[in-house]
Amino acid sequence: GDGRTLQGNGLFDNQGNLVVNLSDSTQEVDVDAGLDNDGSLDVQTGVLRLGGGGTHDGGFTGGANAVLEFSGGSHTLNAGSSVTATNVRFSAQDAGAGNTFIDGTYDVASTEIEANTAHFNAAAQTGILTQSGGTLDGTGTLTVTGQTSWTGGSSVMEGTGITRADGGLQMDGSFMDIQESRTLVNGAGQTANWTAGTLRLLVAGSTLQNEATALFNISGDGRTLQGNGLFDNQGNL
């Protein structure tokens, strides 16, 4: 049923099978208490918001009409965990900035970062990446096989890892920051379109790379590239 809420300072310790199956994709369940998933959690239909944090060694799955949302608190997905849900969202619907540390398998169709900090510390893959806020962090490589959209307000990519846009890149956020030693790659043969906003490579070591045979289009008045980082053009600019 829509609007179910689990509240409090206690813990939901799932070692079995936890299923969320609501009437339609717009209905929501909010878990504001802690939740540890060491079994399986399957969001079949609707939105499951995890806002109380937790430590996870189990699996997260989900259907095409479902969203698994890390909406607050500190979540640690250990090396033995897996996220293969269709749609995953990182937000700040609940109190606190929120941090999600992903050290296990991550292979999903769509990833959306609205707020929160998503730390990808192992090789990860998503079909689509949309970042309109928040921070993409971590030490691993996140490979986007479809469209990468960096849009909306201010947002950050940081850490020592790599974000590979291997299916096209659209950049039109207000302030798009690459920090620390993060590298954003426009993959070989792909097209990047920077149509709005300010791109900031803020520190030495932060890199935007346009690979060989890739095309990087800059259009629109007032585009600004700032900072002490590097634009490494190996393709067509």
Model-derived regions: residue spans:
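Sequence/structural signature of small/polar-enriched beta-strand/turn repeats
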Residues: 1-237
